[in-house]
Amino acid sequence: MISKKLIGLAAFAGLFFAGTASAQSIVGTDHDLSTVQGTGGEICVVCHTPHNSDTTVSEAPLWNHETTAATFTMYTSPTFDGGPPNQPGGASKLCLSCHDGTVALDAFGGGGGTPGNIIGGGALIGTDLSNDHPISFIYDSALATTDGGLADPSAANSGLGGTIDADMLFAGNMECASCHDVHDSTIEPFLRVSNAASAMCLTCHNK
């Protein structure tokens, strides 16, 4: 009979190698932040820490980065049936804690960071999200019916093995991470599925 100790070691090894695979997928990418001041060359520490993490953040494990306190201008349109625009929530707020430019890249581990040490170029989205795909809204069967141009997330295939609801939504909400995988740059820009011939767009939009 296999001992509990061996089973435990096997489980630990599985977690270790899974973590290693994730780390390898971001090495050398735009999310490899090992050159940020104060990291000591560590890739993950800007966002995650094994000790003394921010316990107020539940959307990502062992969170280590200061979160944005900005107020955002959200997307709105006469054709958008997702309800009044909400401020970014869930994992999207964590993404924006670097990408809105209000929080220093090296503001992690309880430190305030270096003023002006912010993300730049096309990655700097800012606080005006009115010209970006809407986020942090409920995408459910009722919205699909009301809109008439959206796939039913409870039934439509995500292209990732399950339904849109199961694979791409977070507590039923559309977020940045619905389309982007922060840890995998295989399909730029960190897309979860290919958008060749607008395939990703057409996952949700019936056009």
Give short role names for the model-derived ranges.
Residues 9-15, 19-45, 49-207:
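C-type cytochrome heme-c attachment and multiheme electron-transfer modules
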